[in-house]
């Protein structure tokens, strides 16, 4: 995405249904996770649990996991947080930045022992070096714990599901895919 920000998510070409029969996905989906490498390194979100081992293995090829200073969980529905347990087995002392409600949801899903949660609220910041993450709570925009993270310097808003849709493509940008397919979804 930039010299400091990489997409490290998963494209799921096989997914046809999400949330049961409520939501069909003609073109699969993607699970978006991002790695910010500055003076400090932050991982934003993970991927769905069926891909947890693959996610961690691919992440290891990208970076020594011990160099990840922070995990930021913008949203904790299982397609965003599903690989967190597998990742925390590797780097159990890494602090997890999320809203108070986000921590509650993670605890409800995974029953973690000894994880280091740092609860953030709107306006809180995390300095990474040249860039700073600013957190913006957006509860119930999509889910009770929804939070955005804005990366100053790079001018990137990590908005999780707020502007997204289920659509599998190798392109990271919506203006580089067939617009008819995009609108159908």
What are these regions (language model features)?
Residues 1-3, 41, 98-185:
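Metallo-beta-lactamase
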Residues 42-45, 70-73, 134-135:
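Short catalytic-loop micro-motif centered on adjacent basic/acidic residues
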Residues 15, 51, 76-81, 103-106, ...:
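Active-site environment of divalent metal-dependent phosphoester hydrolases
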Residues 3-61, 148-151, 155-159:
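Conserved beta-strand hairpin/beta-sheet module of binuclear metal-dependent hydrolase folds
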Residues 90-92, 110-113, 152:
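Short, structured coil segments at secondary-structure junctions
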Residues 55-56, 81-86, 107-110, 146-147, ...:
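Short, conserved acidic/polar surface loops in the N-terminal third of protein domains
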Residues 39, 50-97:
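Active-site metal-binding motif and surrounding structural segment of the metallo-beta-lactamase
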């Amino acid at each position: 995405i930039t010299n400091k920000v990489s997409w490290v998510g998963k494209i799921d070409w096989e997914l046809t249904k999400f949330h049961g029969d409520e939501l069909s996905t003609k073109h699969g989906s993607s699970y978006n996770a991002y790695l910010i490498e500055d003076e400090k390194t932050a991982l934003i979100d993970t991927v769905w649990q069926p891909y947890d081992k693959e996610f961690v293995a691919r992440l290891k090829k990208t970076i020594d996991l011990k160099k990840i200073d922070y995990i930021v969980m913008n949203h904790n529905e299982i397609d965003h947080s599903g690989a967190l347990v597998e990742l925390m087995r590797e780097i159990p002392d890494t602090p997890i930045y999320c809203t108070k409600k986000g921590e509650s949801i993670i605890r409800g899903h995974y029953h973690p022992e000894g994880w280091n949660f740092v609860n953030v609220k709107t306006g809180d910041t995390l300095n990474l070096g040249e860039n700073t993450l600013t957190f913006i709570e957006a509860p119930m925009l999509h889910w009770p714990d929804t939070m955005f993270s804005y990366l100053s310097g790079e001018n990137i808003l990590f908005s999780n599901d707020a502007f997204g849709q289920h659509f599998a493509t190798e392109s990271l940008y919506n203006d580089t895919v067939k617009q008819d397919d995009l609108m159908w979804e």
